[in-house]
Amino acid sequence: MRKTKYTFKYTTAYKKDYKRAIKRGLKIELLEQVVALLSMGEPLPDKNRDHDLSGDWVGHRECHILPDWLLIYRIEDDVLVLTLARTGSHSDLFGK
């Protein structure tokens, strides 16, 4: 079976979140490993707890990089785009 490769689209919020993750000393390689799997259309391991979101984030998915480090993303199959929307802690992203 042929693997799909997506192009990337980064939101402005994601770019800011990425810089914040670096300042916090988070291991960016972990985020990049997850993004690499997503870009190749690979399923994420169970430890990443990948799932659909609802409410304001309907149409997006969320996965865990670490227990309190999340990635919110969207795959647009018709144009083969992986949109990286946000990354950060639960409180950063959902105010909880």
What feature does the model see in each segment?
Residues 1-7, 13-16, 23-29, 63-65, ...:
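Enriched for short, Lys/Arg-rich terminal
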Residues 17, 33-34:
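A ubiquitous structural signal for well-ordered alpha-helices
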Residues 36-64:
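A short, surface-exposed loop/turn module that caps and links secondary-structure elements
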